[in-house]
Amino acid sequence: MIEALYKFTKSHNQFHDRYDETKHKRIEIKFSTVMKANESVINRSNAIDQCKKANLGNRALSSDDMYNYNFDCNIQQVKRAEFDFLYYGLFFADKIAIFQMSSDEIQSCFGYSDKQHKGNEGEGQFHLNRKSIDYHMKNHFVQWLTYEELYNLLSNL
């Protein structure tokens, strides 16, 4: 999707996803599906009921509701030294939000932590959720893409 939208080419090595031949920049791509948080904490007495409810059909979140419901999308295994630009996004029920930030901007990204795993240096993560979505929309939002537009984009490859 990102390759087709922005005319990127295949990566030059295994450490990034695509390459921008025009700007000579390494591109990393990370996306997450947005689902409403569970209504209840899962425990022994409600585990079966929670499993029945834990499907995308019941928990898919529309973009119109991103400020109304709790959700948590983790953009992880972010290795800033391995790319120049990160394209990241959210698959909402009705459309896709696409964001972009430079590797230099990630260090100051709302909620970024460079300590994803014990002893794992140079790799971090950040969350997009009800508390942080406004930061991403104001500072890093690139575009909305409907699923029909995505279908047409991919059909024309």
Describe each region flagged by the PLM.
Residues 26-28:
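Short hydrophobic-acidic sequence motifs that mark active-site Asp/Glu residues
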Residues 1-16, 21-22, 31-157:
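Nucleic-acid endonuclease domains
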